[in-house]
Amino acid sequence: MYYHIIKSPIYPILLAGDEKGLKHLIFLKDERKAKIPNDWVENKDFFREVSNQLEAYFSGKLKTFDVKLAPQGTEFQKSVWKALCEIPCGETRTYGEIAKRIQNPKAYRAVGLANNRNPIAIIVPCHRVIGANGKLTGYASGLDIKEFLLKLEENNLK
């Protein structure tokens, strides 16, 4: 598995993946505490394209990513993550709407758990999922990041 850490406007980001695609995009709130497995190999060039796309996203020039993804999860989780990728930049959906989208309308809590386990933040945009009351709810990386990303997208659409 290859990895590379890039800078972002909010926190450093750990990218990890292999020839199958990107497996992880994780915000490092404290880079010093990042636990990189010993068998992972630093490879900046491997992540050049995704790094360029993330830079364009943060600068407001990119709204849709074109990155080969290889997240690891259950079939249910993968169906949720696929549905998340259909939410346009600058828009939000509720957990219930995602549950209906994957044709499992009662599974809104399970959708929330799948969101929480999303290994590829930003590109699989779990930050675009909000509570039924319109409020920001759970985000594995922290509500500060969720709020930052939603405001970034809102401002970039103006």
UniProtKB/Swiss-Prot annotation:
It comes from the Archaea. Keywords: Cytoplasm, DNA damage, DNA repair, Methyltransferase, Transferase. One of its GO terms (cellular component) is cytoplasm. It catalyses: a 6-O-methyl-2'-deoxyguanosine in DNA + L-cysteinyl-[protein] = S-methyl-L-cysteinyl-[protein] + a 2'-deoxyguanosine in DNA; a 4-O-methyl-thymidine in DNA + L-cysteinyl-[protein] = a thymidine in DNA + S-methyl-L-cysteinyl-[protein]. One of its GO terms (molecular function) is methylated-DNA-[protein]-cysteine S-methyltransferase activity. InterPro entries: MethylDNA_cys_MeTrfase_AS, MethylDNA_cys_MeTrfase_DNA-bd, MethylDNA_cys_MeTrfase_DNAb, MethylG_MeTrfase_N, MGMT, MGMT_N_sf, WH-like_DNA-bd_sf. GO terms for biological process: DNA alkylation repair; methylation. Disulfide bonds: none annotated. The keyword Transferase applies. It is found in: Cytoplasm. Its main location: cytoplasm. It holds the Pfam family DNA_binding_1. Its EC number is 2.1.1.63. The active site is at C126 (nucleophile). The keyword Cytoplasm applies. Involved in the cellular defense against the biological effects of O6-methylguanine (O6-MeG) and O4-methylthymine (O4-MeT) in DNA. Repairs the methylated nucleobase in DNA by stoichiometrically transferring the methyl group to a cysteine residue in the enzyme. This is a suicide reaction: the enzyme is irreversibly inactivated. Belongs to the MGMT family. This enzyme catalyzes only one turnover and therefore is not strictly catalytic. According to one definition, an enzyme is a biocatalyst that acts repeatedly and over many reaction cycles. This is Methylated-DNA--protein-cysteine methyltransferase. It comes from Methanosarcina mazei (strain ATCC BAA-159 / DSM 3647 / Goe1 / Go1 / JCM 11833 / OCM 88) (Methanosarcina frisia). The lineage of its organism: Archaea, Methanobacteriati, Methanobacteriota, Stenosarchaea group, Methanomicrobia.
